[in-house]
Amino acid sequence: MAEEFDFHPMWESLGMNLADHDMLLGAVGQMYGDMFLTQNNRPKSTSYLDFVATNIHSGRIKEMLDKKEAGEATKIVGSFCVYVPEEIVLACDGIPVGLCSGADWATDKVEEHLPRNTCPLIKSFAGFKLGEVCPYIESSDLVVGENTCDGKKKAYEFFATQKNMYVMDIPNVHDESTLVTWKAEVKKLAAKIEDECGVKITPERLKAAIHAVNEKRRALQRLAATRAADPAPISGLDSLLTVQAAFMDDTPRLTGAINDMAAECEQRVEAGEGVAPKGTKRILYTGTPMAVPNWKLFNLIEKAGGIVVGEESCTGSRYYKDLVDESGETVDEMLDAIAERYFKINCAVFTPNDQRMKDIVQMAKDLHADGIVDVALQFCTLYEMESFAVEKAAEEAGIPFVHITTDYAGEDAGQLQTRIEAFLETI
C-alpha cells in the first residue's frame, strides 16, 4: 500500500511536518534494510514484519483513519506503556496504539521544556510531538499516560499542553491494598474511555475484547516458546519487532501473522533449522523497553555472533506472558480480571521487585541462555538502580551477566560492539 499511494495529503491533514517526516522515514527505512534485510535464513513468514515496517507510518495510519470515517471505529487511543489495558479501548470500538518514542528528534525544542538529563524515551516522545513527525501521536484522539517513573509523570504535565491527555495512577507496591486501588483505577479508565468514545461497555463487548487480546498473547507465547531450541529458529531482531508491531497493528491481523510465524518456527525446530548455527551464544535481554526504531543493541549482539533468545522487558515477555481470566460474566468481574492481569507486570517502578529477579533467572534457564545482557537507557534511574539486584540474581544462578547503559544515538556503537564481543568470548 505504501508504495502505491501518496500519503502526503493524509500526513498534511494531520498537521505534520512533511519535509522532516520524509527525512525520518528515509533514515528508518535505511536502518531497517541494513539491520533486518541483511539477516541470513529468516523465516519466510517474517515477510509480515516487512509489511509492518513498510506501512507503519502510512498504510496503517490510513487504515485507522478510514475506519473512523466509516464508523467502524470510534477513537484512536495512544499510550506509551504496557500498563494501559487495550481491552478497554477495544471494548469501546476504539483503536489502541503505541506512540513513537524510539529515536532522538527535535532535541533542541524538547530541552526548552524538559531537562537535558531526561531519559531518551521521554525526550523522544516529546520530540516526536514538537517536531510533528509521528502520525500516531497526531491521529490520537486521546493519549493515556501512567505515573510509572518520575520522569514520565512530570513530562506528561507538559504533554497535556499538546494533546488530550489522561494519566492513570499506578501503585508502586504489590500488595492486596494496592490491588484494590488499582482495580478502582482501571474502572476509572473504563469510564473515561466510554465517555471519550461514546460507547457503553457491555459484558459482550468486553468479553470479546479480552478474548481477542488473549489470542494475541497466546500467539506471541507460542512463537516465544520456539526460541528455546538450539539452533534458534528466529532472530532476536525479528522477535523484538513482533512485539513492537503488537502495539501498532490491527489485532486480528497480527495474531494470524504471529501464529503463521510460530507454525513455521515450530517446523524449523523439528528440522533443526535456525537463523544462526547450533551452539551460537544465547543471550537473554532484560531492561528498559525498546520502541521502534530502537534496534541498535539487538543488531550489535547478533552481528557480533550472538543470538538473542528472549526479552524480559515491556517490549518482550511482560507484554504477553500473562492472560486475562476469561471466566467473568459481568463488566465489573471482567474489569477486575483485567486489573489483576496487568498488576502482574513487574516493572522496575515497583518496590520491592523480587518477582522480576525470579522471572529473569527462570527465563534464562527455560531458554538455555548462556548470558544476560541487562540494559538501561541513560538517566533511567529505576533500571540503573535495579541492575544491581539483577546482577546479584544472575551471579547466584551462575549466569554470566553484563550491564550496559546507552541511549538512542549511534555514537557509542563501536564501544558497545567491543564490550559485547568481549562478553560473548567469556561465556
PLM-predicted stretches and their roles:
Residues 71, 82-83, 88-102, 109-110, ...:
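Redox- and metal-dependent alpha/beta enzyme cores, enriched for Fe-S-associated oxidoreductases
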Residues 117-132, 348-362:
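Glycine-rich, highly charged phosphate/nucleotide-binding loops
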